[in-house]
Design a protein with these regions (language model features):
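Consensus "Asn ladder" position of solenoid repeat domains
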Residues: 57, 63, 87, 108-111, ...
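Acidic, glycine-rich calcium-binding repeat modules characteristic of RTX/beta-roll
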Residues: 103-105, 112-117
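Conserved hydrophobic beta-strand positions in leucine-rich repeat
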Residues: 52-54, 80-84, 104-108, 129-133
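Leucine-rich repeat
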Residues: 46-48, 74-79, 98-103, 123-128, ...
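LRR flanking "cap" motifs
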Residues: 2-74
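The feature encodes a structural signal of leucine-rich repeats
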Residues: 66-74, 90-95, 114-122, 141-144
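Leucine-rich repeat domain C-terminal region
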Residues: 110-113, 120-159
Length: 160
């Protein structure tokens, strides 16, 4: 049994990316991607999502996750690992990211994310073992809790 709010976040990722999701992920060959078919997932004994990977650098840019990170990402409160690298995600990091207090690994590099990094990330930053957001479009100023070396290379040509 899976926690419904966790499944809802996965469904929102699907809804945001419907045009670009690789159909090779359709393991039950139903011609539609369902939440439990999204790449690599690990669930705990209470039905909570603890690891989520939407990462396949071998796929073409035409077949990756796209759209925005759902605002309800903060509902994944048991998440330890979030790997969204090598996708076409756009928009800003949702403020609710600060609710992921169990997060130890956050990989958002090589996307099209931009805007400002929310200060709420400071709620979880001390937990990070690994934090990689390079090759996006994040604009300064960056939250003071994030060492500048962790920001990496950003395209700031469209920043105000």
């Amino acid at each position: 049994c899976y926690h419904q709010s966790d499944l809802d976040v996965l469904q929102d990722f699907i809804d945001n990316s419907s045009a670009t999701i690789p159909m090779i992920w359709d393991s039950d060959t139903s011609d539609s991607i369902e939440p439990l078919e999204l790449q690599i997932q690990k669930w705990d004994e209470n039905g909570r999502l603890t690891k989520l990977w939407f990462y396949d650098y071998t796929l073409s840019d035409d077949y990756t996750m796209s759209g925005e990170i759902p605002e309800n990402i903060g509902n994944l409160t048991q998440l330890d690992t979030l790997n969204l690298a090598f996708n076409q995600l756009s928009g800003e990091i949702p403020e609710s990211i600060g609710s992921l207090i169990n997060l130890n690994y956050l990989y958002l590099y090589k996307n099209k994310l931009g805007g400002t990094i929310p200060d709420s990330i400071c709620n979880i930053f001390p937990n990070y073992i690994n934090f990689q957001i390079y090759e996006n479009y994040f604009c300064p100023p960056y939250p003071t809790c994030v060492p500048i070396g962790k920001i990496g290379a950003q395209d700031i040509s469209n920043c105000p």
